[in-house]
Regions:
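ABC ATP-binding cassette signature C-motif
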Residues: 1-257, 301, 307-549
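Intracellular alpha-helical coupling/juxtamembrane segments of multi-pass membrane proteins
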Residues: 244-277, 281-287, 291-298
Length: 549
């Protein structure tokens, strides 16, 4: 018997004005498929999910969900009911299940022969769906996703906290088809690993957009690439996609050599042994002088991101000694000591609210430690790229916003054609004329990075630079940071990004303890299990030591 499909698309077309985003798409999805959607920012990835969720009906062709099937959608900016608490919003995901329990309890309170059959049927339903443990299931999901306190007012939550509440509500509802737009944004590594396992074992179909390449590798069995309006399916996970894509590009002979090499580098990295990855990160520190020399001889190219490094660093870069910092009645950082060597790249990890941004503010001098010290070397010139996009002018086009209207951009001691510089951030041809106000979240992030990285500096502070980036720009940014002749301190939840780049990890582990570790993220995780046991990698709500005065 042929397998049934849970969703069908036939001759699907979608355009924004004169720009065709999706062209004559024909796809059908199996009810247990796990599919990752890839493509440049603005290629229509989020649009596909909105059409499938029934939120975008302005298209031609056909798109429909199988009869009787249910669909759930996580948007990049999800809506929560402002009149309800965190728990009230989460419980919306199990409203039908609580109604079953409420009806059963009502029947048992007023038991009669007339309702005996209904009560027995409800008991069978409760048994089959394991609803007796519903409260503990909700509590476990909120714990795993590190949701804010149950009684918290959702109108006071950050964007990341709102997304975790919405994701928790969606997963508890258990729809037949899950549509997830950047589900790992604002999730720490432990929560991301939990979500990976949950989705791998999920009984329904999953379509997801994510820039987390390990997540794609560990969850998906298919990759759908959106390429200039077409949808190209690849069977296999992200590693298999890289190999198949590389072969396809060679056959078509249509891509430039730099893109081909970038794909091959990424494929080799995923295939490399942990020992080989570790030796690469250690080699960076030893080769700082060679990095500086190479940077002096480097010339900007059309297909690469170049980060101007500034002057050579002395032996003192950033040093902390007994650093302690509180916020209100919570101790965020207690007795932290570390020394960043020239050439080092530090990955800063931990849950939202743990104190990562506070650490950045102490490095930049915006905040002072309660006790201890933080020393910035005399040769250090800081460059700071935060998460804010508020400074972007929605009325300017991409080229104007990035270049300031100048034909030449100065990158340290080099000069580069401004349109070529925009192209390095994957804005090519007519894309440079697009209005900033009409861009997707990922495209706005690329504009923001392109503007902020021009200034350079020999120590970069990067706050979640990979959020919403397409995989092409992400790989280009990694290549630029690998060649960067300076230090970087990077807040990120992207494990592959941290594995490829980090020479050290600063991990906010809870109870105000921050662990300084030499090695990349993979090494750190192994060390954490050795120190704290296997349970240490399971997500829990962030905890702080109470502040005593």
């Amino acid at each position: 018997m042929a397998r049934q499909f849970i969703y069908h698309m036939s001759g699907l077309n979608k355009a924004y004005g004169a720009k065709k985003v999706i062209e004559n798409l024909h796809l059908s999805f199996y009810p247990d498929a796990k599919i990752g959607i890839l493509g440049p920012n603005g290629a229509g990835k989020s649009t596909i999910l909105k059409i499938m969720a029934g939120l975008d009906k302005d298209f031609t062709g056909e798109a429909w969900l199988a009869d009787g099937a249910t669909c759930g959608y996580l948007a990049q900016e999800p809506h929560l009911d402002p009149e309800k608490t965190v728990l009230g919003n989460v419980m919306e995901g199990v409203a039908k299940k609580t109604a079953i329990l409420d009806r059963y309890n009502e029947l048992m309170m007023n038991y009669s022969d007339e309702t005996a059959d209904e009560g027995a049927a409800l008991q069978d339903l409760i048994d089959s769906q394991n609803l007796w443990d519903l409260d503990s299931q909700v509590e476990m999901a909120m714990e795993a996703l590190r949701c804010p306190p149950a009684d918290a007012d959702v109108t006071t939550l950050s964007g990341g906290e709102r997304r975790r509440v919405a994701l928790c509500k969606l997963l508890l509802s258990k729809p037949d088809l899950l549509l997830l737009d950047e589900p790992t944004n604002h999730l720490d590594a432990e929560t991301t690993a939990w979500l990976e396992k949950h989705l791998r074992e999920y009984e329904g179909a999953v379509l997801l957009i994510t820039h987390d390449r390990y997540f794609l590798d560990n969850v998906t069995g298919w990759i759908l690439e959106l390429d200039r309006g077409r949808g190209i399916p690849y069977e296999g996970n992200y590693s298999a996609y890289l190999e198949a894509k590389s072969k396809r590009m060679i056959q078509e002979g249509r891509e430039d050599d730099s893109r081909q090499k970038a794909l091959e580098r990424e494929r080799q990295w995923i295939a490399a042994s942990p020992k080989a990855r570790q030796s690469k990160s250690k080699a960076r520190i030893k080769a700082y002088d060679q990095l500086v020399e190479a940077a002096n001889n480097q010339r900007p190219g059309d297909a690469q991101i170049l980060i101007p490094a500034g002057e050579r660093l002395g032996q003192v870069v950033i040093e902390a000694e007994g650093l302690t910092k509180s916020f209100g009645d919570r101790m965020l950082i207690e007795n932290l000591t570390f020394k960043l060597p020239p050439g080092g790249i530090v990955g800063v990890i931990g849950p939202n609210g743990a104190g990562k941004s506070t650490l950045f503010k102490m490095i930049t001098g915006q905040e002072k430690p309660d006790s201890g010290s933080i020393r910035i070397g005399d040769t250090v010139h800081l460059g700071y790229v935060d998460q804010s996009r508020d400074h972007l002018d929605p009325n300017k086009n991409v080229w104007e916003e990035i270049s300031g209207g100048n034909d030449i951009i100065k990158l340290g001691k080099f000069e580069m054609n401004s349109r070529a510089y925009c192209g390095a951030f994957n804005f090519k041809g007519g894309d440079q004329q697009a209005k900033v106000g009409n861009l997707s979240g990922g495209q706005r992030n690329r504009v923001h990075l392109a503007k902020m990285l021009q200034a350079g500096g020999n120590v970069l502070l990067l706050d979640e630079p990979t959020n919403d980036l397409d995989t092409e720009t992400l790989a280009a940014l990694e290549d630029a940071l690998e060649k960067y002749a300076g230090c970087a301190v990077i807040i990120s939840h992207d494990r592959m990004f941290l594995d490829r780049l980090a020479t050290h990890i600063l991990a906010f582990e809870g109870d105000s303890h921050v662990e300084w570790f030499e090695g990349n993220f993979e090494d750190y995780e192994a060390d954490k299990v050795r120190r704290l046991g296997p349970e240490s990698v399971n997500p829990k709500r962030v905890t702080y030591k109470p502040l005593t005065r």
